[in-house]
């Protein structure tokens, strides 16, 4: 496969065209008066959304060099989404601004390495300033404000606030599709731990890459399962009941794992294996918690139990189990209420008695998992298209709210980024490093500028007025007013704003220091090649 290489200015300009195409499609969605983007789907109705990362993921460009540029900015959106769960459009706008301004300076002869140093210095100072501005989220009302701003819907903010109030800030909140028109909040008891399936072939929903088990049996053991023969007698009993099984063990490997996957693919039975949560003695305690919650007998050498002798009666059960790549959630375990209450009392006593902050924290986590619930926001809408769009907005709002609880909030609407301008501009530097700092300074204005332009205003006028306003005072594009953003409830999670800036700067610096780009040459179509072979004319 032949490949083509482009160098320096030619390479960067080709990639810039891709950056601009993706960023221009994404940035029309930013702000309260941002527009939607319609995405063509291979199956089903088109998706209408204003979610930056969803739009970015759909963009594939024909030119390989332009596509590489688009993929770089796509990475900014993906990374920001992974870390903060929101702010992907802001990150895209910042990345485009830094790349465009940086490229002008590289073309004028600036050293990309010097620019990178300046960008890094400026971002470090900006993040420091953001943390200084940050305020803690202290009540239910503030949580609702964060959710409402992210989703551009006060009702969604209220649902998220109520859900977090019922299951705690660290509780499990899942988002499901409702069969009706209305969105509802439902709280069900459940336990979640950070271990996922041991093989992707165990999933029951290949689109979401998760395994949903209805009324499963649950095997709880601290043993390592290597031989399929050890669990075969138990699985034979389960096959007759036609119910799925969740296997929680120290590890399922070798012959056992292979046969579980093969039988799952053949449709013989549905089994999902996950590693036991925790480590050392804490692992054993957490397995005991799961056994009590589900009504299982904990199969361990300490109690003299052997896997080969296990029966269905020793298994726990639950109403539902959801397993993803990273997490397992057990909903409505069928454990004895008195046993669960006794375990809760025991944990509370241990929390009071321990002198270790670390142990206390871990005990509180276990208590929360044993007593806490799973809040389910059931999303309703009049059409499938609206349902998908609304679900995406709620997911973003939930992520944004969690981020706010973790690191606090700053003034929204891009105001916080402009508020760090003064502190960043005071960094002492010279030459290309100073130019790198100026690249970031100009980029800090970009989100506010774009929000204003999406509202039909001249962005530069709003930016200049904001630079001279008191810190915290910003432009409310929804009402066309200048207000105290925090008092008005127009806030952004510090984590979202910080992540967007850091990820945008990282990709911009990589872009500017790129000197060569390698891409495959398009294959020539030789179907209409030579003449037909003698004596075979007319044959296909």
UniProtKB/Swiss-Prot annotation:
Family assignment from sequence similarity: Belongs to the chaperonin (HSP60) family.
Cellular location(s): Cytoplasm
Catalytic activity: ATP + H2O + a folded polypeptide = ADP + phosphate + an unfolded polypeptide
Cellular component, GO, one term: cytoplasm
PANTHER family: 60 KDA HEAT SHOCK PROTEIN, MITOCHONDRIAL
Reported function: Together with its co-chaperonin GroES, plays an essential role in assisting protein folding. The GroEL-GroES system forms a nano-cage that allows encapsulation of the non-native substrate proteins and provides a physical environment optimized to promote and accelerate protein folding.
Molecular function via GO: ATP binding; ATP-dependent protein folding chaperone; isomerase activity; unfolded protein binding
GO biological process: protein refolding
First-listed, main subcellular location of the protein, grouped into a coarse class: cytoplasm
HAMAP family: CH60
Residues where ATP binds: 29-32, 86-90, 413, 476-478, 492
Top-rank taxon: Bacteria
Pfam families xrefs: Cpn60_TCP1 (PF00118)
Protein name: Chaperonin GroEL
InterPro entries: Cpn60/GroEL, Cpn60/GroEL/TCP-1, GroEL-like_apical_dom_sf, GROEL-like_equatorial_sf, TCP-1-like_intermed_sf
Organism: Staphylococcus carnosus (strain TM300)
């Amino acid at each position: 496969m032949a490949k083509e290489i482009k160098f320096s200015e030619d390479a960067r300009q080709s990639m810039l065209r891709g950056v601009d195409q993706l960023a221009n499609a994404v940035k029309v969605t930013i702000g309260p008066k941002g527009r939607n983007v319609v995405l063509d789907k291979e199956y089903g109705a088109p998706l209408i959304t204003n979610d930056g990362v969803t739009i970015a993921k759909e963009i594939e460009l024909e030119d390989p060099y332009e596509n590489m540029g688009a993929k770089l900015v796509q990475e900014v959106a993906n990374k920001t989404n992974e870390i903060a769960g929101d702010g992907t459009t802001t990150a895209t706008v910042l990345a485009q601004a830094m790349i465009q301004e940086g490229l002008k300076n590289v073309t004028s002869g600036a050293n990309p390495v010097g620019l990178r140093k300046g960008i890094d210095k400026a971002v470090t100072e900006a993040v420091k300033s953001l943390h200084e501005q940050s305020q803690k989220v202290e009540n239910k009302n503030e949580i609702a404000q964060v959710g409402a701003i992210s989703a551009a819907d006060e009702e969604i903010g209220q649902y998220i606030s109520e859900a977090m109030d019922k299951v705690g800030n660290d509780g499990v909140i899942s988002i499901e599709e409702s069969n009706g028109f209305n969105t509802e909040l439902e709280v069900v008891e459940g336990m979640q731990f950070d271990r996922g399936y041991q093989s992707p072939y165990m999933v029951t929903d290949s689109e979401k890459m998760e395994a949903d088990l209805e009324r499963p049996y649950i095997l709880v053991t601290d043993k390592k399962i290597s031989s399929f023969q050890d669990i075969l007698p138990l699985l034979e009993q389960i096959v007759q009941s036609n119910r799925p099984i969740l296997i929680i063990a120290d590890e399922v490997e070798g012959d056992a794992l292979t046969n579980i996957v093969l039988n799952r693919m053949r449709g013989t039975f549905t089994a999902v294996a996950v590693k036991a949560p925790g480590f050392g003695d804490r692992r054993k305690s957490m397995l005991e918690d799961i056994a009590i919650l589900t009504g299982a007998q904990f199969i361990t050498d300490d109690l003299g139990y052997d896997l080969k002798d296990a029966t269905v009666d020793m298994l726990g059960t639950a109403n539902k189990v959801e397993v993803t790549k990273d997490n397992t959630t057990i909903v409505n375990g069928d454990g004895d209420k008195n046993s669960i209450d006794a375990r809760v009392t025991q944990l509370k006593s241990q929390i009071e008695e321990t002198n270790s902050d670390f142990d206390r924290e871990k005990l509180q986590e276990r208590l929360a998992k044993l007593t806490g619930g799973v809040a389910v926001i059931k999303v309703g809408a009049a059409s499938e298209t609206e349902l998908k769009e609304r679900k995406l907005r709620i997911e973003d709002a939930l992520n944004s709210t969690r981020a706010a609880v973790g690191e606090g909030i700053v003034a929204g609407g891009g105001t916080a980024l402009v508020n760090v301008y003064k502190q960043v501009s005071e960094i002492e530097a010279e030459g290309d490093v100073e130019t790198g700092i100026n690249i970031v300074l100009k980029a800090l204005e970009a989100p506010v500028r774009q929000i204003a332009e999406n509202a039909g205003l001249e962005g530069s006028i709003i930016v200049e007025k904001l630079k001279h306003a008191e810190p915290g005072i910003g432009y409310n594009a929804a009402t066309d007013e200048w207000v105290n953003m925090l008092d008005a409830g127009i806030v952004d999670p510090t984590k979202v704003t910080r992540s967007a800036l850091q990820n945008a700067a990282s990709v911009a610096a990589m872009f500017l220091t790129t000197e060569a780009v390698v891409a495959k040459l398009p294959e020539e179509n030789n179907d209409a090649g030579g003449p037909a072979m003698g004596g075979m004319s007319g044959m296909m």
